[in-house]
Amino acid sequence: MTAMNEPWPCASEFAILSSDVHARWKNFGNWDRTYFPKLVGLQVEDIRLGYCRMVLPFREELEQPMGIVHGGAIATLIDASVVPAIGSAYDNTIGYSTVDLHVQYHNALIKEDAIAEAWVTKRGRSVVFCESEVMGRTSGKRIARGFMTYNISTLRPMTK
């Protein structure tokens, strides 16, 4: 885990993905059916092995009554931004789910896009630890930081 005052790792520190894995994760959330990531408008800007940069474009619908972006939208960005970072190391037979999510809010996000830089800090056999840093795209302000633990498992066929 990086210290609170340390900057997050740079994308260039992470290995480039094969073209097929990159294509799979670059389109995260842009599926035929509308799932939650697409509903809130999340977009992957960069994906590498163990790393993802994702944007939450500003929309008025994401604001709370005081005119700032709702903390739940920021928490969603934090949680979702690590999914491609985790998944970049696995094939489609592996599932993962959030076990723990801790968010620290530093500043309000006001009428600007949020950019999350997310990375895997440690991979175990059944658990992955991740971090995500959210900044305002135009202001450059640190908006929030997230620390997550994900469970890793083999997918089982769905039954009716």
Report the location of each language-model feature.
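Terminal targeting signals and extreme-terminal segments of soluble enzymes
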Residues: M1-K160
